[in-house]
């Protein structure tokens, strides 16, 4: 989970100076994601820094239904019923409870993570390319407030055929490269509301921390 937190929670500000072709592709992608009543997603992530010798990988999955979501990253889990959000951290056996709308711009809701480009960036259409034998659009994102964030570029790979997000790469100022790859996406996936119910009894020995 820490990899994705590092990759996504540092995004902020408002967009300007957009590339028309890139913007049209991203607008279509946002509309597709927001048009889903529910969806299921699986992904992999990697953080690499040659200077420090860092090379860490994690996998995750998430279910989204309206404003509710359940997401797991490595050994950690986030559950939100749209009102409250619980982050279960197994390393220190703690559960952190917050209001679902608190720090909304830093939400780990998969739907919001998959539309994070909607604000905070200039964008530029780079080229068409191939990714795993599939034609993709390559779009660069550049933060408006570059001096306030730890990265300088995010590269998006969007399927030319389906207009789905396939991969995102973040390049940090210290040489760290973070990669997020979508491995499965199921539209309007069947998911019961019980998936988004948190029960402290299922986590004996854990400490509940309320903000």
Where are the regions a protein language model picked out?
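An acidic-aromatic
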Residues: 59-108, 178-179
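Short, solvent-exposed helix-to-loop capping segments enriched in aromatics
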Residues: 33, 105-120
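Gly/Pro-enriched, hydrophobic low-complexity segments
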Residues: 125-128, 132-207
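Short, exposed beta-strand/loop patches in secreted or surface proteins that constitute
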Residues: 32, 60-63, 77-78, 123-130
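Sec-dependent N-terminal signal peptides
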Residues: 3-12
């Amino acid at each position: 989970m820490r990899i994705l937190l590092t990759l996504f929670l540092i995004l902020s500000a408002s967009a300007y100076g957009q590339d028309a072709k890139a913007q049209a592709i991203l607008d279509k992608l946002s509309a597709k994601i927001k048009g889903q009543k529910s969806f299921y997603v699986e992904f992999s992530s990697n953080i690499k820094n040659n200077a420090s010798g860092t090379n860490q990988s994690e996998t995750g999955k998430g279910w989204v239904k309206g404003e509710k979501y359940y997401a797991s990253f490595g050994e950690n889990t986030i559950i939100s019923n749209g009102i409250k959000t619980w982050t279960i951290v197994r390393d220190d056996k703690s559960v952190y409870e917050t209001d679902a709308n608190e720090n909304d711009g830093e939400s780990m809701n998969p739907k919001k993570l998959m539309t994070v480009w909607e604000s905070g960036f200039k964008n530029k259409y780079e080229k068409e390319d191939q990714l795993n034998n599939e034609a993709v659009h390559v779009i660069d994102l550049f933060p408006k407030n570059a001096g306030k964030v730890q990265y300088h570029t995010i590269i998006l790979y969007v399927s030319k055929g389906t207009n789905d997000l396939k991969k995102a790469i973040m390049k940090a100022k210290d040489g760290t490269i973070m990669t997020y790859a979508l491995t499965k996406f199921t539209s309007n996936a069947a998911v019961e509301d019980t998936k988004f119910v948190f029960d402290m009894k299922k986590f004996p020995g854990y400490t509940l921390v309320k903000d």
